[in-house]
């Protein structure tokens, strides 16, 4: 799955140069429960000083932030009222990716963060495209991400003519 350029960070830790590849989802879940030293050892395979461990954890955080902030990997979102459910899903995204990609949930945990985000985005879009309500939801999700108004659509909606200045300096409305 090489559709997205993946950030790799080069570091010198413990006197050695290493390149951190994008972390797997399983490692990210484990990292949340570990000390910086344990997490750094998980990602590098080396026992490191406290400073180097923090450096590695910061680098991993940068890779995750890069993957999450990429516009091409953004999962569509549109707020909607839903019945309040007293439980929280912890692996809903992983289950969605597993069903979409024909993988098992454990296989999903072995994906790196970039591949996971790409598949999650595609799974959400694919699932929403299946119904009229979902297609409307996708259009609304797209609409709220736009930062520049579509002036032609606004003019049409409010029946406003476009002002055009000709070469001779006269103004006309079209």
Question: Where are the language model's segments positioned?
Answer:
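Intrinsically disordered, low-complexity regulatory regions of eukaryotic regulatory proteins
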Residues: 92, 148-150, 166-170
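Short acidic DE-rich linear segments
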Residues: 158-174
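A structural signal for alpha-helix termini and helix-coil/disorder junctions
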Residues: 66, 70, 144-147, 160
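Long, compositionally biased
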Residues: 126-156
């Amino acid at each position: 799955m090489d559709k997205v350029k993946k950030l790799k960070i080069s570091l010198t830790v413990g006197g050695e140069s290493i390149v951190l590849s994008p972390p797997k989802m399983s490692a990210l879940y484990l990292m949340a429960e570990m000390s910086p030293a344990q997490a750094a050892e998980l990602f590098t395979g080396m026992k490191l000083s406290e400073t180097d461990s923090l450096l590695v954890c910061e680098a991993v955080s940068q890779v995750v932030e890069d993957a999450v902030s990429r516009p091409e990997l953004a999962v569509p979102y549109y707020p909607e009222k839903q019945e309040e459910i007293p439980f929280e899903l912890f692996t809903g995204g992983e289950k969605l990716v597993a069903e979409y990609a024909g993988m098992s949930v454990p296989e999903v945990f072995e994906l790196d963060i970039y591949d996971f985000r790409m598949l999650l985005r595609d799974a959400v879009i694919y699932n929403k495209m299946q119904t009229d309500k979902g297609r409307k939801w996708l259009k609304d999700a797209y609409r709220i991400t736009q930062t520049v108004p579509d002036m032609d659509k606004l003019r049409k909606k409010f029946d406003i003519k476009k002002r055009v200045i000709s070469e001779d300096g006269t103004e006309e409305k079209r």
